[in-house]
Amino acid sequence: AASGASIFSAKCAQCHLGGKNIINPTKTLSLADLQANGKDTVSAI
């Protein structure tokens, strides 16, 4: 199975470089934003 880091690099890093979000700057990968947007669990992602 692929590691989380390799999956992130392949599928997410283009838009979430440095934990930010180039599409919607208010939805970063900070824990506070993940919780506010209901994306703070593995199953939610």
UniProtKB/Swiss-Prot annotation:
Subcellular location, principal: other
GO molecular function: electron transfer activity; heme binding; iron ion binding
Coiled-coil regions, chain positions: none
GO CC terms of this entry: plasma membrane-derived thylakoid lumen
Disulfide bonds: none
Post-translational modification: Binds 1 heme c group covalently per subunit.
Binding site for heme c: 12, 15-16
Keywords on record: Electron transport, Heme, Iron, Metal-binding, Photosynthesis, Thylakoid, Transport
InterPro entries: Cyt_c-like_dom, Cyt_c-like_dom_sf, Cyt_C6, Cytochrom_C550
GO BP: any one term: photosynthesis
PANTHER family to which the protein is assigned, alphabetical: CYTOCHROME C6, CHLOROPLASTIC
Quaternary structure and interacting proteins, as annotated: Monomer.
Family: Belongs to the cytochrome c family. PetJ subfamily.
Protein name: Cytochrome c6
